[in-house]
Amino acid sequence: MKLHELKPAKGAVKEVKRKGRGRATGNGKTAGRGHNGQNSRSGGGVRIGFEGGQMPLARRLPKRGFTNIFAKVYNEVNVDVLNKFEDGTTITPEFLKEMGVIKQIEKNGVKILGNGNLEKNLTIKAQKFTKSAAEKIEAAGGKAEVI
């Protein structure tokens, strides 16, 4: 097969329906909109969620829960992710953002979790550490410092 022999997949190319271009086209006069009514008008149609006057689903279902404005939000980083850094590196939230480990620093900072194993000797500065994370960091010869 050569470049000039390529053809689109069957059913991939549809013929354009030119609407309102005479009765012989099959899309003339009303252009596929049926006869009079709200949907035949320009800009016609009902708003999203409108169910013809019936009580909409969003209002039939009860409200549930709330958002706690005092919730503490942390970036959670597991210790096994930190293996990719060199021995003796000092790791801070800003450093993690710079290296692309986290996208942005959350309002309460970074929490280091203890999932996986740490083989590197690192100094890690973060807002919170789990017990297992702190133990693994110190077992590898590093330091876990709370900022």
UniProtKB/Swiss-Prot annotation:
<feature type="compositionally biased region" description="Basic and acidic residues">
    <location>
        <begin position="1"/>
        <end position="15"/>
    </location>
</feature>
<keyword id="KW-0687">Ribonucleoprotein</keyword>
<dbReference type="InterPro" id="IPR036227">
    <property type="entry name" value="Ribosomal_uL15/eL18_sf"/>
</dbReference>
<dbReference type="InterPro" id="IPR030878">
    <property type="entry name" value="Ribosomal_uL15"/>
</dbReference>
<dbReference type="GO" id="GO:0006412">
    <property type="term" value="P:translation"/>
</dbReference>
<feature type="region of interest" description="Disordered">
    <location>
        <begin position="1"/>
        <end position="47"/>
    </location>
</feature>
<dbReference type="Pfam" id="PF00828">
    <property type="entry name" value="Ribosomal_L27A"/>
</dbReference>
<comment type="subunit">
    <text>Part of the 50S ribosomal subunit.</text>
</comment>
<dbReference type="GO" id="GO:0022625">
    <property type="term" value="C:cytosolic large ribosomal subunit"/>
</dbReference>
<keyword id="KW-0689">Ribosomal protein</keyword>
<dbReference type="GO" id="GO:0003735">
    <property type="term" value="F:structural constituent of ribosome"/>
</dbReference>
<dbReference type="InterPro" id="IPR021131">
    <property type="entry name" value="Ribosomal_uL15/eL18"/>
</dbReference>
<keyword id="KW-0694">RNA-binding</keyword>
<comment type="function">
    <text>Binds to the 23S rRNA.</text>
</comment>
<protein>
    <recommendedName>
        <fullName>Large ribosomal subunit protein uL15</fullName>
    </recommendedName>
</protein>
<dbReference type="InterPro" id="IPR001196">
    <property type="entry name" value="Ribosomal_uL15_CS"/>
</dbReference>
<comment type="similarity">
    <text>Belongs to the universal ribosomal protein uL15 family.</text>
</comment>
<dbReference type="InterPro" id="IPR005749">
    <property type="entry name" value="Ribosomal_uL15_bac-type"/>
</dbReference>
<feature type="compositionally biased region" description="Gly residues">
    <location>
        <begin position="23"/>
        <end position="35"/>
    </location>
</feature>
<dbReference type="GO" id="GO:0019843">
    <property type="term" value="F:rRNA binding"/>
</dbReference>
<keyword id="KW-0699">rRNA-binding</keyword>
